[in-house]
Amino acid sequence: MGPKRRQLTFREKSRIIQEVEENPDLRKGEIARRFNIPPSTLSTILKNKRAILASERKYGVASTCRKTNKLSPYDKLEGLLIAWFQQIRAAGLPVKGIILKEKALRIAEELGMDDFTASNGWLDRFRRRHGVVACSGVTRSRARSSAPRAPAAPAGPATVPSEGSGGSTPGWHTREEQPPSVAEGYASQDVFSATETSLWYDFLSDQASGLWGGDGPARQATQRLSVLLCANADGSEKLPPLVAGKSAKPRAGQGGLPCDYTANSKGGVTTQALAKYLKALDTRMAAESRRVLLLAGRLAAQSLDTSGLRHVQLAFFPPGTVHPLERGVVQQVKGHYRQAMLLKAMAALEGQDPSGLQLGLVEALHFVAAAWQAVEPSDIATCFREAGFGGGLNATITTSFKSEGEEEEEEEEEEEEEEEEEGEGEEEEEEEEEGEEEGGEGEEEGEEEVEEEGEVDDSDEEEEESSSEGLEAEDWAQGVVEASGGFGGYSVQEEAQFPTLHFLEGGEDSDSDSDEEEDDEEEDEEDEDEEDDEDGDEVPVPSFGEAMAYFAMVKRYLTSFPIDDRVQSHILHLEHDLVHVTRKNHARQAGVRGLGHQS
């Protein structure tokens, strides 16, 4: 079995050519075995000797990696980037992979290359094409990001002890499937949420983390900052960040520190620091005569004492819940912070100023404050809406909240009511069936009376049919509202197939009873006018399928809002009753029309 085929670099091919020229008396087969290549490959290399040597001179150091003359689709961009890279390295300054990517994006913008993204895969291929050696701690591999990664986030957020468990916080009960329920009755500007994240700094000055000739092993960046971010649901208030680190609190300059800073041995937000933060927030809310709800997650608050808080109610997300600010806000803050560091590094490299690569704690705090300020309020409100908290200015959270005991009692009551309703429904059905049988026997006897009284009774039948069989939208909407205890004042206009739906507050009159009486009088007048026509037009009766399709549309609209299980149960009961009534009325009306044709 011959040697395994592999593609040689230009440097390896040049070395083979040199070996052949230095040993003219050596057989070609012996040289092929020495380099573990087939004789045919050796013949091809010698045939293309001039082109191979030219390519080696062209690519220089990169010839140790390049195997073909195939150009990159971004060849012009990479030419400018490698020239800039060589200039910076000649000055003895380190260049990290993230800085290479940022510089490449700038060059692409100048060249108008909108499709260029500077991905990790491109960076890996760029290094291979141009012989850029990745030292430890810089561009690690194709599958890993070049930026340093913070440690894994701590375990799930703390849960609040129930009332009587010894905790100082009142007995909030939060359920994983309905985390916004605790915010019922609060305006969106009074619902705050806080989360903790990590940022890194002081890794730009690591001289050993350079590319292409780094002097020794790289030192991992160990300077980590824990940042507590807090904002309200409509994004109108972003509280100053609380930053914690291991370094001692720096001296404030003339303008002071841009955000609060606390130091401890672990570099995280401690219970004491959080208590002080909440106390300051409570004092501020007292001065503004406001009572707010603060939803927290991933905080060191298991043993937090909140007995002194009068204007701030604290609650926690259950484990496994995605925090509102973690739906995009935290990522934005990290992106703005990283961008600020890269811009600083780029300016230092292009100005060949090694001292510019030093990032101190005070400057890092300014970067944190600027990154938090750059987040748009609309983005914060969007993340809260995605988490189920509504959003928008002056909006009110209307989701329901009940304790476990209340929910169990309501479930038991609902089960008892359902059993009673089922029993009553069966009795009513039996009575109605008996009445229908008696009515069917008496219809033939009273047929002559119907003919004598005639058209007035027919108009009454048609009026009853239109009100019960037609299933008007206002009656359906009002019935659903009464069953659910009242929705908000929603009004939806359907332009095409369906009539206008007005969902009013439970117990509210639509336009007063006088309007309904006027409508009834107008219908009576129209029926009397139709009596003069011997071939009077019959009121069209919707089919059972049409009626149920209409109800399905209304049901979809109702269930698109956040409703509790009790309202859902009422909707199901209403659907059952409507099916029963519609079938009965449809059968009765068909029987009346059949008797009319026979007479």
UniProtKB/Swiss-Prot annotation:
Where's the Glycyl lysine isopeptide (Lys-Gly) (interchain with G-Cter in SUMO2) crosslink?
A: K246
Compositionally biased residues, Acidic residues: 405-475, 506-538
PTM entry text: Poly-ADP-ribosylated by PARP1. N-terminally methylated by METTL11A/NTM1. Alpha-N-methylation is stimulated in response to extracellular stimuli, including increased cell density and heat shock, and seems to facilitate binding to CENP-B boxes. Chromatin-bound CENP-B is primarily trimethylated.
Cite a GO CC annotation: chromosome, centromeric region
In terms of SUPFAM superfamilies, this protein maps to:
Dimerisation domain of CENP-B (SSF101160), Homeodomain-like (SSF46689)
Domain HTH CENPB-type intervals: 65-136
UniProt keyword Nucleus, yes or no: yes
What does the UniProt entry say about where the protein is found? Nucleus; Chromosome, Centromere
Which of the residues bear the PTM N,N,N-trimethylglycine?
G2
Which positions does the record tag as DNA-binding?
28-48, 97-129
Which GO molecular function annotation, any one, does this entry have? DNA binding
The record's principal subcellular location, in a coarse class, is: nucleus
Ranges where the record places region Disordered: 143-183, 394-476, 498-543
Any idea which residues bear Phosphothreonine here?
A: T396, T398
Phosphoserine, modified sites? S165
Enumerate the spans annotated as HTH psq-type domain: 2-52
- List the biased-composition ranges (Low complexity): 144-158
Report if keyword Ubl conjugation is assigned: yes
**UniProt KW keywords:** ADP-ribosylation, Centromere, Chromosome, DNA-binding, Isopeptide bond, Methylation, Nucleus, Phosphoprotein, Ubl conjugation
Which residue intervals make up region (Homodimerization)? 536-599
What subunit structure does UniProt give? Antiparallel homodimer. Interacts with CENPT. Identified in a centromere complex containing histones H2A, H2B and H4, and at least CENPA, CENPB, CENPC, CENPT, CENPN, HJURP, SUPT16H, SSRP1 and RSF1.
Q: What role is this protein assigned?
A: Interacts with centromeric heterochromatin in chromosomes and binds to a specific 17 bp subset of alphoid satellite DNA, called the CENP-B box. May organize arrays of centromere satellite DNA into a higher-order structure which then directs centromere formation and kinetochore assembly in mammalian chromosomes.
- Which protein is depicted? Major centromere autoantigen B
Source species taxonomy: Eukaryota, Metazoa, Chordata, Craniata, Vertebrata
The gene name on file is Cenpb
